[in-house]
């Protein structure tokens, strides 16, 4: 595997010779980095595994002594550390446990690793740690191990946090992009763009009328309700970096299907829509921290929608589109005026360091 990864080629593998902010933005450059460097280096080399890799998902699924576990990790570098509706501590817990939930898993354990900058006020650290504890109690997950490093003053930005999580997947639950097929319905759990706009508003000192709070929230209870109700969930994806657009492009690409969206039922709060219009942003690409998209069989869509709407975090859930066999790997939006446009991956970085 190492020899294959280091093959000499006269054509550069990457467009940029150095890491760019957009390599962490959830768009095209991030996908190229993952698929061009990390996956070839780290994918399983077990005998017989070649050509049989599962599509990438928010969590790895590991079988151990008959049990199926979900395992994931995430790193949080949000700036500022505190923002309307949340903080880096809540993000560090909810972000990782939400990734576990996207595999249908009940979160069990977390690790927490801190990179602290010299000079950080202890009161700031105390607030972040207290927030993490409260968030963990809300989810019902235990923080069981961790690590701490301190870097020189000016070599960090206050606090960076990494969390890794393990969760248990109930028997019979199979959630993966590989299960997505033409005819499936696409359901969005709530309005878009709150988190990205909330963070950017504070960071840039922007003031909007009715400025939104982040949607930072746990999705574990919502997924547990769907699983307990026996919902046939083909795929789940939380809408973090790159927003709804990035999530659906990933699913369409990995499943080899097309996805057609209707603009009209996609909920966007008025303050978010106004801020996006003013700043030239598309809400489809703005990050969320408490929203998911569910892809289910068409015949199960209405029942799934009602279950979702019974949960406070998904009260505004809506069916927003369908999976097709037209233009595999492509996401297309039908506008309220009847026009159509391709919803592609971003090539640059819209809102850096929002999680």
Enumerate the language-model features and the residues they cover.
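Helix-biased detector of long, well-ordered alpha-helical tracts
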Residues: 1-355
